């Protein structure tokens, strides 16, 4: 095991990092963690392997984990690759999940804020008898979000 390892952040690359950060602040209560990031130069190019790379963005504290909890890092590069179509079953990172009080209401709020529907609200029962009501939606840039609520 790697000594001292703990979860730090998840990164989203955005077309418009400020608009996407605002979406996560307004819809899920994420809190900006200053300072905004603005990097360029040879160290960034070497670290990313992208010649001419420049990036700007911010970290947002995720809700429910206190002042030292993990963040959502939203960056924009000056050089962007095309994004593939949304697919919840693509290998690699699939989605970010938020526990909410009311899944259908949260779904409607995300859609009203520019997100898109991926699937329908469903409830599944685990082998232990717990129930999870959930749905997949996207943020305004097409990143998949799971909205979920657990009950016994």
What residue spans do the PLM features occupy?
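Eukaryotic phosphotyrosine signaling hubs
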Residues: 7-9, 91-95
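Core segments of cupin and vicinal oxygen chelate
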Residues: 13-68, 112, 128
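Generic beta-structure capping elements
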Residues: 63, 75-77, 150
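Vicinal oxygen chelate
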Residues: 1-3, 12, 34-35, 59, ...
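Amide-forming acyltransferase catalytic core, primarily the GNAT-like/NAT-type
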Residues: 59, 79-80
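A short, acidic/glycine-rich surface segment
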Residues: 41-46, 80-85, 124-126
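Short, flexible turn/loop "capping" segments at secondary-structure junctions
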Residues: 2-4, 88-89
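Helix-adjacent hinge/juxtasegments
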Residues: 72-76, 86
